[in-house]
Amino acid sequence: MQCVKLPVSVTVEINVLLLAVTALALFTRLYGIHFPKAVVFDEVYYGQFLSLYMKQVFFIDESGPPFGHMILALGAYLGGFDGNFVWNRIGAEYPGNVPVWSLRLIPALAGSFCVPLAYLVVVELGYSHFSALGACALLLMENSLIVQSRFMLLESVLIFFLLLAVLSYLRFHKARNSFFKWFWLVICGVSCAFGIGVKYMGMFTYFLLLSLAAVHTWQLIGDQTLSHGKVMFQVLVRFLALVVLPVIMYLGFFYIHLTLLYRSGPHDQMMSSAFQASLEGGLARITQGQPLDVAFGSQVTLRTVSGKPVPCWLHSHKANYPIRYENGRGSSHQQQVTCYPFKDVNNWWIIKDPGRQSLVVSSPPKPVRHGDIIQLLHGMTTRYLNTHDVAAPMSPHSQEVSGYIDFNVSMPAQNLWRVDIVNRESEKEIWKTILSEVRLVHVNTSAVLKLSGASLPEWGFKQLEVVGDKIYKGYQQTGMWNVEEHRYGRSQEPKERELELKSPTHSDVNKNLTFMAKFLELQWKMLTVKNEESEHKYSSSPLEWITMDTNIAYWLHPSSNAQIHFIGNIVTWTTGNITLVVYCLLFLTYLLRRRRKVEDIPQDSWEQLVLAGVVCLGGWAVNYLPFFLMEKTLFLYHYLPALTFKILQIPIVTEHLYIHVLRSSAQQKAFGGVILAVLCSVYMSYHSLSPLTYGQPALTSDKLAELRWRESWDILLRKR
């Protein structure tokens, strides 16, 4: 019982330096984040989606997966934001009901914690706490990172998860076999999933870590001290944590996203009819009570499965193709058939049995099956859908599609079409409303009814061209159609049938669509549907990022010279470029000399330098070079993940030079003086640019002109 008398004690180690830099980071990122109380640059973009999120309205953002929006929505939810604000312009004042501080809080916290994470990464790479402190100092005083952290933007959140993923993998790699070894591996997989879930750019660092893990796993396989069972276990756990877990989490983001956003929204028409029908208040409103099976006599609207260039419906109207086109080619002068991107009474067609004259559904209904031959009669003009060996107006390599008019010339009707249900489960599959994807094949010519994507001239009312494609091969969404609105025709009399076509369909049901079907469709749309790219005043090329030849004006006060710019610490950016070159020269020199059996540094220092290069130089490269291949509008802030890894490289190269290259005490003292001078210059640059970083105080025009350190920088000066 003597042990009971002993005091219970707990020993806790506190890294005071780490706590200090974390506190400083929180101060630099959180100080005055409610200012300005106005929309700042891309807040106008993310804010629109945030409002839709708060109202649980479906939307598509092709810029990235939904997890980033969920994070911003969490801040909005905690602040009590109801989504009622119109995000229509940069500089718009936030009313009192918009919790500005809460909306900007999570990005600011993420940006703050990037600083201690950088400290831990440098230490985990095997470098001194002094070097880690240097990395923190550079990040603390990096104006561009501060600006991007202080507003409702996602780059700081992305960088936080990337650094956490790198730190977790390094700790896993260095840990001995224990619970914490596998804990860090799981954290790495989770962080990678979060990073990718915020922005697709997270894939770059994920692939870097996967490559590093593959190399380490290959070395593990060659370890003869491990049994086959242990090797298999190690490989399996790595695969589960770094591949399977991120995939499951990525799917989970979309599952939550689609569960939360269940209401019809502004982007519905980009999705398939089945997807739209699954949203509350959207297509479901007009599809309730529709017959599921398409039958002879059915009145239908046919929507193209493809969303390119826009979703549209098979359409015809009382206007003919011109006798001759502008280029002198002749047409059939038949009635125009187009694809129209709006709901209209002229989108209705009647599916007719070629062997019967009746235009109504029989009792019982005779369903249309895969392989059946049909005629399509335009409901309002009673012209049959027709194609023939006449060149289409905008796509002369394809056949013209028309509503057949008998001009008493040697041009007989060719209006028979074969129904090919592409997603059928059996050869006798019945054509289903919304669910079936159908290819309509012309019986006479084997041409497929297809949306060409071209727009007709003024004579075609700028509607989209529909053609008969004789060289159609494989699965092409432009040649797939589905029945969206559907009713059983009941009237044989033309006047009564016209009234029937103009009457609304029934109202409010959900069509069941599995999560995986919705996920695959949404993911495909996000990757393929792009908004029209337009030149932006502040867009830039990756070559301009290296030397920061550009900046971005984020906000300007409506009456004073107070303004906020995305602009970096020019001393840090220049130093980073120099250390990248120095690292490459060092690496190549060591590599060539080691090839000649000359070892300038110990083996463990060489391995340390290589690993640091893979993480930092590799992190910079994978987050920078891919932008040269992208055809999209790019901005300077896209460089931030690469910049972060480049900054980590600076103290690493500095320490290596100090210890392994500069041998004498005099050289080291002189180099120490250079380091101190650079840090002072970094601070002076940060301090000078801080009015443009924080937006206050407002400077005079003369002071602003003095901050234009490069001719290419766009500093805003008010005209007197």
From Swiss-Prot:
Annotated GO MF terms: dolichyl-phosphate-mannose-protein mannosyltransferase activity
EC supergroup of this enzyme: transferase
Membrane topology reported for the UniProt record: Multi-pass membrane protein
Tissues/organs with expression: Widely expressed. Has particularly strong expression in testis, ovary, brain, liver and heart.
Record-listed E.C. numbers: 2.4.1.109
Domain MIR: 291-354, 365-422, 426-486
Transmembrane segments: 7-27, 67-87, 105-125, 127-147, 150-170, 178-198, 201-221, 239-259, 570-590, 609-629, 633-653, 670-690
Disruption-associated phenotype: Morpholino knockdown of the protein results in developmental delays at 18 hours post fertilization (hpf). At 48-72 hpf, the tail is slightly curved and somite boundaries are also abnormally curved. Swim bladders are incompletely formed. Glycosylation of alpha-dystroglycan (dag1) is severely reduced.
GO cellular component: endoplasmic reticulum; endoplasmic reticulum membrane
Pathway annotation from the record: Protein modification; protein glycosylation
Reaction equation(s) it catalyzes: a di-trans,poly-cis-dolichyl beta-D-mannosyl phosphate + L-seryl-[protein] = 3-O-(alpha-D-mannosyl)-L-seryl-[protein] + a di-trans,poly-cis-dolichyl phosphate + H(+); a di-trans,poly-cis-dolichyl beta-D-mannosyl phosphate + L-threonyl-[protein] = 3-O-(alpha-D-mannosyl)-L-threonyl-[protein] + a di-trans,poly-cis-dolichyl phosphate + H(+)
InterPro entries from the UniProt entry: GlyclTrfase_39-like (IPR027005), Glyco_trans_39/83 (IPR003342), MIR_dom_sf (IPR036300), MIR_motif (IPR016093), PMT_4TMC (IPR032421)
Pfam families documented for this protein: MIR, PMT, PMT_4TMC
PROSITE patterns, per database record: MIR
Localization (cell): Endoplasmic reticulum membrane
GO biological process: protein O-linked mannosylation; regulation of eye photoreceptor cell development; regulation of skeletal muscle fiber development
Gene3D superfamilies listed in its UniProt record: 2.80.10.50
Keyword tags: Endoplasmic reticulum, Glycosyltransferase, Membrane, Repeat, Transferase, Transmembrane, Transmembrane helix
SMART domains, A to Z: MIR
Family label: Belongs to the glycosyltransferase 39 family.
Function: Transfers mannosyl residues to the hydroxyl group of serine or threonine residues. Coexpression of both POMT1 and POMT2 is necessary for enzyme activity, expression of either POMT1 or POMT2 alone is insufficient.
Protein name, UniProt field: Protein O-mannosyl-transferase 1
Organism of this sequence: Danio rerio (Zebrafish)
